[in-house]
Amino acid sequence: EQGGSQAGGSL
């Protein structure tokens, strides 16, 4: 996943 939830940028 690209920019999903893990290393995406939500936090």
From Swiss-Prot:
One of its GO terms (molecular function) is chitin binding. It is an enzyme of class 3 (hydrolase). It comes from the Eukaryota. Its EC number is 3.2.1.14. GO terms for biological process: chitin catabolic process; defense response; polysaccharide catabolic process. Keywords: Allergen, Carbohydrate metabolism, Chitin degradation, Chitin-binding, Glycosidase, Hydrolase, Plant defense, Polysaccharide degradation. Belongs to the glycosyl hydrolase 19 family. Chitinase class I subfamily. Hydrolyzes chitin and may play a role in defense against fungal pathogens containing chitin. This is Endochitinase.
